[in-house]
């Protein structure tokens, strides 16, 4: 075979090989494009041009963000319905998704210490918003370990020091301050032409809060100074707003000892308490035992209901009926 013939054969083989490679590569090219499109998130947890993704710890905060931002953002709730936020552990998928988000909100509910997400500027990593910023916080209990401020060189036990009560969403007055901080962060996150929408929504939401605060103030005014008994101490800010006092059965995120239960029961009998309030996320055994010992009953109030305004009314009505 001549050199020219060899060249023709080689050219023909190259031609067939090229066609084969191109044909086989087409599906992978499309797959690659699809993968690239799905991964084209600008580091923000959502595809380019879509809504910014915001993670909030519990559904009441979802309600606030929806009221202020409307449909400008995509809101994800970390702790699901029926779960206890104090002991919740996010799934691996949730942690991956949070790392891709635009904004990650923390409420110092305890479970935030169960994961780590590298923060950023909203593009290379999520912005952070501490939902307790600018608030006049009440002292909490050792079931909320996310805000300890102890000296790492100090060997003493400080389990009960410098802890904040995180249940701030159950107070209209603290919600107003929170709403301002949320609106400020949303303006940082969203385009400038969204500011007027945020301002209008914020004004309307604060009006709703002001109205419910006035309504509940009138409802509970005759009961000023009275006590109500709860299993979990989630209602201190609510009590503060309306000059009430909550008495918690749970001590340091644990059921009371028999001795402690006896002391609480004795106090409840003296104060003629007939209702022990429980929330569905917690074991109710101790509360039911206490209720039986005082010839009372348990009643449910759920601090984690999404619609804060409606829930505040329900909580107030339930407490009012027990006083």
Question: Each predicted region: which residue ranges?
Answer:
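Bacterial N-terminal signal peptides
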Residues: 12, 16-30
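Extracytoplasmic metal-acquisition and chelation regions
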Residues: 3, 33-323
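N-terminal secretory signal peptides that target proteins for export/translocation
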Residues: 1-15
């Amino acid at each position: 075979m001549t050199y020219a013939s060899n060249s023709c054969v080689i050219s023909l083989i190259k031609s067939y090989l090229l066609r084969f490679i191109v044909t086989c590569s087409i599906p992978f090219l499309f797959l690659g494009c699809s993968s690239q499109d799905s991964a084209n998130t600008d580091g923000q947890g959502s595809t380019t041009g879509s809504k910014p993704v915001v993670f909030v710890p519990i559904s009441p905060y979802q309600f606030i963000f929806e009221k202020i931002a409307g449909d400008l953002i995509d809101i994800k709730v970390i702790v699901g319905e029926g779960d206890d936020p104090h002991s919740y552990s996010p799934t691996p998928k949730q942690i991956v998704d949070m790392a891709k988000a635009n904004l990650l909100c923390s409420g110092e509910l305890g479970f935030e210490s169960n994961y780590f997400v590298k923060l950023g500027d909203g593009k290379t990593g999520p912005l952070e918003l501490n939902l307790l910023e600018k608030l006049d916080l009440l002292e909490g209990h050792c079931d909320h370990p996310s805000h300890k401020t102890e000296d790492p060189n100090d060997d003493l036990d400080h389990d009960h020091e410098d802890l904040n009560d995180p249940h701030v969403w159950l107070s209209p007055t603290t919600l107003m301050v929170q709403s301002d901080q949320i609106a400020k962060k949303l303006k940082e996150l969203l385009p400038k032409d969204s500011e007027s929408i945020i301002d209008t929504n914020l004004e309307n939401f604060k009006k709703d809060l002001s109205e419910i605060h006035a309504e509940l103030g009138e409802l509970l005014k005759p009961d000023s100074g009275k006590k109500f008994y709860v299993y979990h101490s989630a209602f201190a800010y609510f009590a503060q707003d309306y000059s009430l006092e909550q008495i918690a059965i749970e001590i340091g995120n644990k059921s009371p000892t028999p001795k402690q239960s006896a002391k609480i029961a004795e106090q409840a009998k003296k104060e003629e308490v007939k209702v022990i309030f429980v929330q569905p996320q917690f074991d109710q055994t101790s509360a039911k035992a206490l209720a039986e010992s005082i010839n009372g009953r348990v009643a449910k109030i759920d601090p984690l209901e999404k619609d804060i305004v409606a829930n505040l009314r329900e909580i107030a009505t339930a407490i009012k009926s027990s006083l």
